Curated annotation (Swiss-Prot):
This is Probable chromosome-partitioning protein ParB. Keywords: Chromosome partition, DNA-binding. The gene is parB. GO terms for biological process: chromosome segregation; positive regulation of sporulation resulting in formation of a cellular spore. GO terms for cellular component: chromosome.
Length: 290
């Protein structure tokens, strides 16, 4: 990618044709002569390479499929031609739900755009529609930062958020893998996560597990962390975790793609707890174990 391409977004969304695409996604209007609206067969469409969503809830997809069976697809998906096929820029959930509904073809807005515009559009569309969980959104913002060398201010303008919001979101990527998994699965909220950033290493993971076990509010979490910090590492009120156990906990979380808690007893006995938030997530964990 050239420096001109890397700085492309700094010139504004219009330079990538994204203003027109956003309009098409919102109301399916045809922005210019390069845009075409037609029905495409399901099998000539493929998922977008730049889809930032890592999880799609099966129950929500089935609900959407039921809606499509009853009313059809009201809003076309947006695709771009890739060889003899079409790659999804926006609307992968609709495409997958259409397959569940038994449709053979779907309405699509076809727009020939560059890789640069495709990745940016996929990220922006998902962020603006709030389709992403906090970690997916942070990872998407990081890609805009890394792949296009955008500033936090440019990203904020592109996705319609404040600069502070973008910066705080990106900071979530510094969380431990197991803590990020807990946030993704809804066991922690953004307030808890921001407070946990004040801790590092296994202490952060310990605190996250205490938050869940005691059902602490964000304010209670902040007080706990402030107390730990003021008391120092020797505080009798702070539980300890063996660093080797903490490393194993992080390793298992990475391998399983889920938050893992290890509670190791004094006599060698303990518990291994794998956290999941839906039957779909459990199925994914079992697939990795098999």
């Amino acid at each position: 990618m050239s420096m001109t391409q890397k700085r492309g977004l700094g010139r504004g969304l219009s330079d990538l044709g994204l203003n027109e695409l956003l309009t098409e996604i919102n109301d399916a209007s045809l922005a210019d002569s390069k845009t075409e609206l037609k029905k495409l067969t399901i099998d000539v469409i493929q998922p977008g390479r730049y889809q930032p969503r890592r999880q799609m809830d099966k129950d929500a997809l089935e609900e959407l499929a039921n809606s499509i069976r009853a009313q059809g697809i009201i809003q076309p998906i947006v695709v771009r031609p890739v060889g003899q096929r079409y790659e999804i820029i926006a609307g992968e959930r609709r495409w997958r739900a259409a397959q569940l509904a038994g449709l053979k073809e779907v309405p699509a807005v076809i727009r020939p755009i560059t890789d640069e515009a495709a990745i940016t559009m996929s990220l922006i569309e998902n962020i603006q529609r709030q389709n992403l969980n906090a970690i997916e959104e942070a990872a998407a913002l990081q890609r805009l930062l890394d792949e296009f060398k955008m500033t936090h201010e440019e990203i904020a303008e592109a996705v319609g958020k404040s600069r502070t919001s973008v910066t705080n979101s990106l900071r979530l990527l510094k969380l431990n893998p197991d803590v990020k998994a807990l946030l993704e699965q809804g066991h922690l909220d953004m307030g808890h996560a921001r407070a946990l950033l004040a801790l590092e290493g296994f202490q952060q993971s310990e605190a996250a597990n205490i938050i869940i076990k005691r059902a602490l509010s964000v304010r209670e979490t902040e007080k706990l962390i402030q107390h730990w910090q003021s008391e120092g590492k020797s505080s009798a009120n702070r539980p300890s975790m063996d660093p080797d156990v903490a490393r194993l906990q992080h390793h298992l979380s990475d391998k399983l793609g889920a938050a893992v808690t290890i509670r190791h007893g004094a006599k060698g006995k303990g518990k291994l707890i794998i956290h999941y938030n839906s039957a779909d997530e459990l199925e994914g964990i079992l697939d990795r174990i098999r």
